[in-house]
Amino acid sequence: MGFIDLATNLIFPPKCANCKELISSDITKKQIDPLCPTCRMNFENEKQRECNRCGLMMKFCRCMPKNMSRAQCSSLLKLVSYRPQGNDMAIRNFIYSVKHSNNKVTFDFIAEQMRELLISEMRGASLLPSDCVITFLPRSHQNKANDGFDQGYELAKSLARVMGIPMVKCFNRKLIAQEQKNLNQYERRLNMKSAYTPCEVEDEIKDKTIILVDDIVTTGASMASGARLLFAMGAFSVIGVCIGTTEKTKS
């Protein structure tokens, strides 16, 4: 922990990203945990949950929504199963914090968690960091203006740093695209078809495996839309990675 971080923690003691209780800061740690011990334990327990489709723990699960399969995505890596209407407040509050609080500690923590999944996936596919590029799905202009940041960009930036893989912005978000959470599955798919436009980065992603970052994946429409654009730009393959997925139904 650097001097500036230490001084900041002394003046503004860190609070748990989930329950908002003060966290005792350990100056010997290289990285601050954004969760208090109780919430961290709950988070780790959520990671041990089994996927209701394949029966594997979330860190081993590679299930993905049909939209992503149709778009030829290779896999979807996720940390937890997200149930927005469930009782798992530890996850719901944490996701809310990611979306609405621009906290570098939280993004770095998630990136370290994602790193473990990606290393395993890359080894299985014989991929080197030089074979890959990290990108993200841009947030809507309205939400970015409301909160002052884009959580997808922040997650991708932290993940690129811990993985030693370059991050490239591959999409722009159109102003006309609606907020996904208010749409049904069919409407989401139509909305996402016109939500993004490609950036002129073909030379940077051609023949690369693209690691596409998002916070929550529900129907996979956003990921699928991004993947199709990436393939059209010359990408070799697309791996999705997210904090959690709400996908529940069996294929």
What is each stretch, according to the model?
Residues M1-S251:
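Glycine-rich phosphate/pyrophosphate-handling loop used in enzymes and phosphotransfer proteins
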